[in-house]
Amino acid sequence: MNTAPWRIGVDIGGTFTDLVMLDSRDGRIFNGKVLTTPHAPEEAVLEGVRDLLARTGARADAVRHVIHGTTLVANALIERRGVPTGLITTKGFRDILEMGTELRHDTYDLFMRVPEPLVPRHRRLGVAERLLPDGSVREALDEAGAREAVRALRAAGAKAVAVCFLHAFRNPIHEARMREILSEEAPDLTICLSSEVVPEIGEYERASTTVCNAYVQPVFERYLRRLSDGLRGFGLTGPLFLMLSDGGTVAEETAARHPIRLVQSGPAGGVEATGIYGAAAGARDILCFDMGGTTAKAALIDNGEAKRSLDFEVARVDRFRKGSGLPLKVPVIDMIEIGAGGGSIARVDRLGLVRVGPESASSDPGPACYGLGGARPTVTDADLVLGYLGAESFLGGAMKLDVAAAEAALGEHIGKPLGLSVPEAAWAIHETVNGNMAQAAAIHALEKAKRIDAYAMVPIGGAGPVHACHIGMKLGLRRIIVPLGAGVASAFGFLAAPISFAFIQGWVAPLAGLDFAKLREITGTMTAQGKAMAAAAGVAPEAASARILGAMRYAGQGFQVEAEIPAESITRGDAAMLRAKFEAAYLALYGRTEPSLPVECVSWQVIVAGPRPVVDLTQQGAAAEGTLHRGTRRAWFGGAYTETPVLNRLALRPGESVQGPALIEERECTLVLPPGATARCDAALNLDVTLPA
């Protein structure tokens, strides 16, 4: 077993790439942040790793492993930068990607926009074959027609092929044979089968997910090869692990086969981190607020556990409207996008209202204040002009910000159209962003039958602590926990995530009279697969654990509720226990149950995980770094500039308190502490903020 002391976490965002290097011997943590290189994302990773090795003095062979999360998969889908992909499906069903379901995300809009399918119609082909809902063969696969379809797709320029036959999740026999034919006729094509990517009921969602996986897989595989080669070039011989969207990590080889499982990998690391930070501060109910350079996301953690979901959307045509994107059936941590990021561009609409996002300046050209060619105002430009960010101290002074360029962009695009001064224009952007995010977070909590003011906020991301207190006051929160290293929290979260993978198998059957022998076979097979995968990633067999979850519903419903099922209840065939677990989960979501209705099982999931790495936050800071007071800076509070103390975050020690207004800076982020708020440094070096009533 590799016992090298250093571990590295890397998160590629739309604007910055964040890195954390942890010494497992004494808990020392070193953070890094570099501009993302969109044309070749691995270049930013390698630059950041090179810098960390130099700063720590660590040898490359002293690095145990690198754990990596990235927006590459999501961005490839949003920006349509995958490879030309084909779809082979059951004859008569090739238009499923356009037909979708009967659900409309805007019922009354006759001109409602929907996402364009990733596969155009001329590369969607049907092949004669048919399985019945129970998986039995009604019509054998037409192999001659299958070969013709493969040749047609090659002629049409396809580089990857998704195969999605009707009811294949119940019996993969035809999809497996289709793969053999594809390998014979076109061995250079990437092949993805729906029975392997998402073996669940729901033809449209299954097809969409499989197509998305095929569309990005060649791009992602090439990226992983370049990154692995670059790391080995440094002498890093330890394995590369990838963060999944549900909070687990997997070996590089597994991630290469299932890139769609990484669609939310970066934000998932952030949620993992906030749970650790909150627990260190004694908080169990947490609002994770993650505001980076491109977007802001929120997630609720109840009693120390983040909720998971099997439904997600990407590439929405209407950013905040559910149902307007490409549906994915993948395990994800339940979170929502609630607003813009630091690089989001502000504008005035035709009604004279300030709008922010979704368009982002990203890292190239970036906000106007970066001096890299950006000329349109962003949230970061507004925060700089308001005095919340320091022009000379951004990224620890490694990157100087151009205040004049930010003022010019704000005045031209916001101030002039609205008749506002430059500071007023900056405040309009700041308030618009904060108001939108507060409203979205409150609605998200209400949809979960929760009160948002019952949570403590943990803000992370480079822009999170800048906006946290103002958003918290709008939400009526009393407590905000700001961790040390909040600006690189997602990368830190990767280091605390276990080796884990979720296996799913659809099997629709009534609970009454359920064939428990078949269920034991299904869950046993998935458990064995998971333990083999964990062992390949270095987890000892005795250290791997398995959880079983069942997705169930009342007969006749079109949605299901997931509940954790004790393995012993399956062993002894206890249908009453399964129903009790389902109804407890249903009651928690909807406040009622229907005892008279029969229950139907829809799918089963086994999550196999290794032990969770232990990260002791109390070891983060061995000694204070630098002096506490850095002087003052004019910052905007109460409608005017106020000379505000600027403090060094790394010089604050446990037990010390700061009264607002104050600007508390560290290399990767700044906490804006408004008048009336108090921040106390706790034993884990969190800043525990109490907001004014």
Language-model segment annotations:
Residues 1-86, 132, 139-162, 175-180, ...:
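N-terminal glycine/serine-rich phosphate-binding loop of ATP-dependent small-molecule kinases
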Residues 4, 12, 144-157, 265, ...:
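C-terminal, non-catalytic interaction/recognition modules in large multi-subunit enzymes and RNPs
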Residues 9, 16-20, 30-31, 35-44, ...:
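Conserved phosphate-binding loops in N-terminal lobes of ATP-dependent enzymes
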Residues 19, 31-39, 86-92, 112-113, ...:
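Glycine-rich phosphate-binding loop of actin/hexokinase-like ATP-binding domains
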Residues 70, 165-166, 194-196, 245-246, ...:
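Glycine-rich beta-strand-to-loop/alpha-helix junction loops that act as flexible
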Residues 162-210, 214, 393, 565-567, ...:
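Terminal amphipathic helices with adjacent charged low-complexity linkers/tails
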